[in-house]
């Protein structure tokens, strides 16, 4: 029995990155041997075991053959006669097919070290196109390692495009798609993931609402980049630099979905796009089973981001309605989330990096003034029932008006 460290742990060590988990492949053994040694079986579809002490994963070397649709349509053969090279051959990319034995010796039958040094994401064999999930995985690796200069080999991108056109992506479950999106939105440079999916024609299958934004024109004075899809990618990059919150990044991705449905006769203006985006967000989130907090913030940002951009022109009563719609009195974190998305939207435009954007500061000050209005004096003044709410709203409007006047006097 021979044991090798494989996959991400070897790759990340060679890249000088921290290793968070270790996976091993076991060659020349069988399931009963591992069971006798106290390993715990955890793989339902594949022979995977947990080490009795470290709880790290150990998998028997195996061969996979395509026999059905989707990423689960594989027959697995695991036996003592499966070699290390055969096991590594089934993996997606050369950089993930490097093994290391217990003495530290590296095994690299498919040129992974060379591709690591040259910053190339390259598939190992034509069998790459048998697994539709690999389209998402490669795009995610491209995003994850973008800061290191990695790019996808042209022949691999061509296979990804072929796979996207084959219909295989339709067999991915909503849960699996969201899991990949969640991973990429939680990491570095998430915009790269969506740009690559657009380039390889997978985005129109997986997230047609986002893909539809590419090619939609916007006013060049407000969006010098013109293309709405490009703007959303720029905004997502900004959001990822300003916040690690999944909900903020997802809401930024979805904030302009309504622009794809702007009537042609009013283009390149997009009046009402926030409201048009709401049903699209609901449908997307229902289809992919997106968590409720991500869905709810995305809807609010779609509806309200244009109001924040014009906050200094809003009447105090309208500003209070914005706060009420956010339910900031019970969920104050929503305001900071909305403002982060609006900042990403504003600065996610060509040539806007040095522009002033005072509106978020004004909105925050207006909220601080409104939330400071106390209920106790209203009750002590003799108001009851609905009259308390009306008087509270009235006093909050006055507080917002004071802030508005101070800003106008600047």
Curated annotation (Swiss-Prot):
Keyword terms: ATP-binding, Hydrolase, Magnesium, Metal-binding, Multifunctional enzyme, Nickel, Nucleotide-binding, Nucleotidyltransferase, RNA repair, RNA-binding, Transferase, tRNA processing
Cofactor binding description: Magnesium is required for nucleotidyltransferase activity.
Domain HD, chain residue ranges per copy: 228-329
Gene3D superfamilies: Beta Polymerase, domain 2 (3.30.460.10), cca-adding enzyme, domain 2 (1.10.3090.10)
Binding residue positions for Mg(2+): 21, 23
Annotated positions binding ATP: 8, 11, 91, 137, 140
Residues where CTP binds: 8, 11, 91, 137, 140
Signal peptide: none
Record-linked SUPFAM superfamilies: Nucleotidyltransferase, Poly A polymerase C-terminal region-like
Enzyme Commission number: 2.7.7.72, 3.1.3.-, 3.1.4.-
Subunit comment: Monomer. Can also form homodimers and oligomers.
Record remark: domains: Comprises two domains: an N-terminal domain containing the nucleotidyltransferase activity and a C-terminal HD domain associated with both phosphodiesterase and phosphatase activities.
Reported function: Catalyzes the addition and repair of the essential 3'-terminal CCA sequence in tRNAs without using a nucleic acid template. Adds these three nucleotides in the order of C, C, and A to the tRNA nucleotide-73, using CTP and ATP as substrates and producing inorganic pyrophosphate. tRNA 3'-terminal CCA addition is required both for tRNA processing and repair. Also involved in tRNA surveillance by mediating tandem CCA addition to generate a CCACCA at the 3' terminus of unstable tRNAs. While stable tRNAs receive only 3'-terminal CCA, unstable tRNAs are marked with CCACCA and rapidly degraded.
Family (UniProt): Belongs to the tRNA nucleotidyltransferase/poly(A) polymerase family. Bacterial CCA-adding enzyme type 1 subfamily.
Further comment: A single active site specifically recognizes both ATP and CTP and is responsible for their addition.
The name this protein goes by in its record: Multifunctional CCA protein
Source organism of this protein record: Tolumonas auensis (strain DSM 9187 / NBRC 110442 / TA 4)
Gene, per the UniProt record: cca
């Amino acid at each position: 029995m021979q044991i090798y460290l494989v996959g991400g742990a070897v790759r990340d060590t060679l890249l000088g990155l921290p290793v968070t988990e270790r996976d091993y492949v076991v060659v020349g053994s069988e399931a009963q041997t591992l069971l006798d040694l106290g390993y715990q079986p955890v793989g339902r579809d594949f022979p995977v075991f947990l080490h009795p002490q470290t709880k790290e994963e150990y998998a028997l070397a195996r061969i996979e053959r395509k026999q059905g649709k989707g990423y689960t349509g594989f027959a697995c053969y695991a036996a003592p006669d499966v070699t290390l090279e055969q096991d590594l051959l089934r993996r997606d990319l050369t950089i993930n097919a490097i093994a290391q034995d217990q003495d530290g010796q590296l095994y690299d039958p498919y040129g992974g070290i060379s591709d690591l040094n040259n910053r190339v994401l390259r598939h190992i064999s034509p069998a790459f196109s048998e697994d539709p999930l690999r389209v998402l995985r490669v795009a995610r690796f491209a995003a994850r390692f973008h800061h290191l200069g990695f790019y996808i080999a042209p022949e691999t991108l061509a296979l990804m495009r072929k796979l996207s056109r084959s219909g295989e992506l339709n067999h991915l479950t909503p849960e699996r798609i969201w899991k990949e999106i969640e991973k990429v939105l939680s990491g570095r440079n998430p915009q790269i993931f969506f740009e690559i999916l657009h380039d390889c024609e997978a985005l129109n299958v997986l997230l047609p609402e986002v893909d539809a934004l590419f090619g939609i024109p916007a006013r060049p004075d407000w969006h010098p980049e013109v293309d709405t899809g490009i703007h959303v990618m720029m905004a997502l990059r900004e959001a990822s630099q300003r916040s690690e919150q999944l909900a903020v990044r997802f809401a930024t991705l979805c904030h302009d979905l309504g622009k794809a449905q702007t009537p042609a006769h009013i283009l390149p203006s997009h009046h009402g796009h926030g409201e048009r985006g709401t049903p699209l967000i609901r449908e997307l989130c229902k289809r992919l089973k997106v968590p409720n907090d991500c869905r709810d913030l995305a809807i609010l940002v779609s509806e309200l981001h244009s109001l924040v951009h014009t906050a200094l022109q809003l009447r105090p009563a309208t500003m209070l309605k914005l706060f009420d719609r956010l339910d900031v009195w019970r969920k104050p974190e929503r305001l900071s989330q909305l403002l982060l998305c609006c900042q990403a939207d504003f600065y996610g435009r060509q040539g806007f990096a040095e522009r002033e954007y005072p509106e978020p500061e004004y909105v925050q000050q207006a909220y601080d003034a409104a939330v400071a209005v106390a209920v106790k004096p209203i009750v002590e003044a003799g108001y009851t029932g609905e009259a308390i709410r009306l008087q509270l709203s009235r006093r909050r409007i006055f507080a917002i008006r004071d802030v508005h006047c101070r800003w106008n006097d600047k």
